């Protein structure tokens, strides 16, 4: 049995879920020995985070009560599942969640040219502050490096889905 199958079995036994959406590297086929296992579990269970280790793989699994998706919720909170793999979906909750997230992404306005220019000005200002070569300068270097991926996506008029996907788009 492969590790993903063992993890899915663990999730089913532990949470008796209505739905499971796997996202990230185990969903897109880029998992390696250092990958964690990202998933959203919808179950008659309290909201929690499961960071158990199964056969050396760390879980990054978010469990949400079914009620979360039966009332109004912010789809931005769940944007990571937009292209995830639905493993289990007893009542089409996962299907509706993905659809709602995709609609949210499509409705998200792109940044204007002025907003992008402001972001680029901010980058230049931050890079100039890194020249101090002190603790604050090193912090600002990290900050601009982190934010530059999202700014790159803004420039290219792409939705930012996180660092791994942004790096692949480059």
List the predicted regions and their residue ranges.
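Metal-dependent nucleotidyltransferase catalytic core
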Residues: 1-34, 40-87
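Conserved NTP/Mg2+-binding pocket subregion across the NTase superfamily
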Residues: 50-135
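Conserved nucleotidyltransferase catalytic core and NTase-mimicking acidic/glycine-rich helix/loop elements
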Residues: 111-170
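Context-gated lysine
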Residues: 6, 12, 33, 47, ...
């Amino acid at each position: 049995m492969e590790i993903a199958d063992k993890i899915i079995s663990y999730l089913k036994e532990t949470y008796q879920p209505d739905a499971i959406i796997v996202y990230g590297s185990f969903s897109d086929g880029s998992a390696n020995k250092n990958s964690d296992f990202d998933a959203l579990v919808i179950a008659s269970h309290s909201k929690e985070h499961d960071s158990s280790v199964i056969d050396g793989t760390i879980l990054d699994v978010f469990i949400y009560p079914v009620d979360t998706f039966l009332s109004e919720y912010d789809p931005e909170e769940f944007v990571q599942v937009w292209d995830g793999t639905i493993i289990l979906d007893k009542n089409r909750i996962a299907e509706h969640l993905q659809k709602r997230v995709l609609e949210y992404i499509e409705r998200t306005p792109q940044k204007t040219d002025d907003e992008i220019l402001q972001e680029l000005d901010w980058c230049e200002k931050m890079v100039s502050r890194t020249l101090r070569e002190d603790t604050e300068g090193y912090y600002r270097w990290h900050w601009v490096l982190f934010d530059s991926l999202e700014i790159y996506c803004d420039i290219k008029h792409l939705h930012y889905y996180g660092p791994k996907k942004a790096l692949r788009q480059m």
